[in-house]
Amino acid sequence: MLSVAARSGPFAPVLSATSRGVAGALRPLVQATVPATPEQPVLDLKRPFLSRESLSGQAVRRPLVASVGLNVPASVCYSHTDVKVPDFSEYRRLEVLDSTKSSRESSEARKGFSYLVTGVTTVGVAYAAKNAVTQFVSSMSASADVLALAKIEIKLSDIPEGKNMAFKWRGKPLFVRHRTQKEIEQEAAVELSQLRDPQHDLDRVKKPEWVILIGVCTHLGCVPIANAGDFGGYYCPCHGSHYDASGRIRLGPAPLNLEVPTYEFTSDDMVIVG
């Protein structure tokens, strides 16, 4: 009954005044012993009585904000004026300090700042990615000593006319042929319609008397024999491919002409291949 009275709000004084105890219908198992001469209770006058009149003096007499409902307990909200509301103005941009302004007025400034941060971040990421890719690619490139071996210098005066000399270049055989005037005229007179891989002799040489070729057969990679075959050029003993003095395929299973590497004449007596 006390809990109901506490939750009843403004009806609590009425309910507490009309509350009374009602004896239950069950009888206790053990009969209480009533003394023959009951003693009168002694009241401790030093302790205050918890009555409505004594507690009314301790109630808050200032204006309160109270909320009362039928199914909820009564609640009281006090006004705390000593609580300091945190201010985050130092962390906010100047464009958004005024809370009364519309967000559309500061949208351009906010977007500009966002674009600036995005642009700077993109440039930084691109620069870091460029350095990473450059280091990765440079680690796979050939070193200086390997690049030095990628080129070979050949002294042409050591090769007599009508002879072919073989060199090793990048792990492959390199043929340098000093042609005679007869061979030059013979190869220049060949019609392109007779060739499997049509290519004029002048398109394969920089100087008519010098022919520089990679000595690897275009069929299965065998090394041809110089000054041999039906056309007086090169002959592959593996499957019988015949090349002329310009390195063009004339007979046999090879599909293409012998490869011409990149070379440059530095002088009349020196050529650099590679």
Swiss-Prot record:
GO terms for biological process: mitochondrial electron transport, ubiquinol to cytochrome c; respiratory electron transport chain. The keyword Magnesium does not apply. Residues 141-274 are mitochondrial intermembrane. Residues 79-103 are mitochondrial matrix. Keywords: 2Fe-2S, Disulfide bond, Electron transport, Iron, Iron-sulfur, Membrane, Metal-binding, Mitochondrion, Mitochondrion inner membrane, Respiratory chain, Transit peptide, Translocase, Transmembrane, Transmembrane helix, Transport. It is an enzyme of class 7 (translocase). It comes from the Eukaryota. It is found in: Mitochondrion inner membrane. The keyword Iron applies. Its cofactor is [2Fe-2S] cluster. The Rieske protein is a high potential 2Fe-2S protein. Belongs to the Rieske iron-sulfur protein family. This is Cytochrome b-c1 complex subunit Rieske, mitochondrial. It comes from Pan troglodytes. The gene is UQCRFS1.
